């Protein structure tokens, strides 16, 4: 049975609320100068908290609740790891807000490796005990998610020697190391972590799947996640088209092929899941799935060099892509999981108002970012009141999270486990 620790998920949602609030301030800074705010420091704190405070903490809660037995979930080590990680998140956040990214904050990031390594080791050890020799497809995806989670930290660990050797914080090697971390977080840990939870849901409801097909799907996605990193190398060395073609035509087409192989199976799975799902959960999961398909298409489209250059130089497109993965895929799926298994069902007509506001806000922001990026691309320039409009739409995200947290508190008697 899948369970959720209400206290932990509320902490993760509070982290997400701070992330969204910071993002709103960053938008407002383009309308009115905020003399008290160091933009770069806030921006760095924003993405750090998004990755470690929201996605990682929420995944931590959901993975433990989905993959471990109640007895394993109650072990002291998981409670200790959660609160140590949350304490470190607060320390890193305050460091970044006040001092920005430095050797000290890199050291703090390395501390995450220790805590995350402890979590991964503990989960894998307990999974071996609870699952025995039973090869579950969800476990296989989870192991790959953990592989990418740990692999991504090579990007952070390498920053210190790069700065010492090259004495240039913004050197090409610094760029490649930071992108290494982000790439394997967004395209590895996020995606495979979500898929592991999705397949665990399928197993939980006793739905049979073609495991051979989905193992082929898994291998192709794994190869594509590794190959698509070459796009970052191309952006670092734009004269070398071979890197672009490897990433976009190779990695992109592999992902499209992977999705094509299981497209009918996914349709069948959604059909069999429908009777089990909250109506809001079903909509959110389809939203995340469509966003995932759009992500794959975009990775193929930028195989054309001019489009790849546009994607890099027009900041609106870059932000829209990161938001597509972080908000439209990862966050939407995590909300869907919370609605489904934290029992936030439509007890009242307005129970999921926060979910609706969140979905509308992120979709509107994505469309506006892509529209403004296209206007810049064709030489039209900025639309009238663009910054005011995107600020107002972004404001809906923290408001929606407040509503979601309120619902978690209001129905805290559901889905609770040992605190």
Task: Briefly describe each language-model feature range.
Residues 1-419:
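Hydrophobic alpha-helical transmembrane segments of multi-pass integral membrane proteins
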């Amino acid at each position: 049975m899948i369970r959720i620790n209400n206290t932990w998920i509320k902490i993760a949602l509070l982290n997400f609320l701070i992330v969204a609030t910071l993002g709103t301030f960053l938008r407002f800074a383009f309308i009115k100068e905020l003399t008290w705010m160091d933009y770069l420091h806030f921006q760095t704190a924003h993405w750090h908290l998004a990755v470690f405070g929201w996605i990682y903490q929420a995944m931590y809660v959901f993975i433990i609740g989905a993959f471990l037995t109640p007895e394993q979930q109650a072990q002291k080590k998981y409670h200790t790891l959660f609160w140590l990680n949350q304490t470190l998140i607060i320390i890193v956040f305050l460091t970044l807000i006040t001092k920005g990214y430095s050797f000290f904050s890199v050291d703090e990031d390395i501390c995450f490796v220790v805590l995350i390594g402890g979590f991964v080791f503990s989960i894998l050890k307990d999974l071996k005990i609870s699952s025995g020799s039973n090869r579950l497809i969800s476990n296989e995806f989870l192991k790959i998610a953990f592989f990418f989670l740990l692999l991504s930290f090579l990007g952070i660990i390498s920053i210190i020697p790069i700065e010492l050797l090259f004495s240039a914080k913004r050197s090409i090697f610094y760029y490649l190391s930071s992108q290494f971390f982000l790439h394997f977080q967004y395209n590895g840990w996020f995606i495979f972590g979500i898929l592991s939870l999705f397949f665990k849901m399928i197993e939980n409801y006793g739905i049979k799947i073609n495991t051979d097909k989905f193992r082929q799907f898994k291998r192709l996605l794994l190869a594509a996640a590794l190959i698509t990193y070459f796009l970052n190398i191309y952006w670092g060395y734009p004269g070398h088209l071979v890197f672009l073609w490897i990433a976009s035509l190779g990695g992109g087409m592999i992902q499209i092929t992977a999705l094509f192989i299981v497209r009918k199976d996914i349709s069948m799975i959604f059909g069999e899941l429908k009777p089990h799902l909250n109506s809001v959960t079903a909509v959110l999961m389809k939203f995340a799935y469509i966003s995932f398909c759009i992500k794959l298409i975009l990775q193929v489209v930028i195989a054309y060099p001019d489009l790849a250059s546009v994607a890099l130089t027009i900041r609106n497109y870059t932000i829209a892509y990161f938001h597509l993965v972080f908000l439209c895929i990862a966050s939407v799926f995590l909300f869907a999981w919370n609605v489904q298994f934290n029992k936030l069902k439509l007890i009242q007509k307005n129970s999921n108002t926060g979910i609706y506001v969140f979905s509308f806000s992120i979709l509107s922001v994505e469309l506006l970012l892509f529209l403004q990026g296209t206007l810049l691309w064709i030489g039209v320039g900025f639309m009238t009141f663009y910054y005011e409009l995107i600020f107002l739409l972004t404001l809906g995200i923290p408001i929606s999270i407040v509503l979601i947290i309120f619902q978690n508190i209001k129905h805290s008697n559901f889905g609770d486990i040992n605190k």
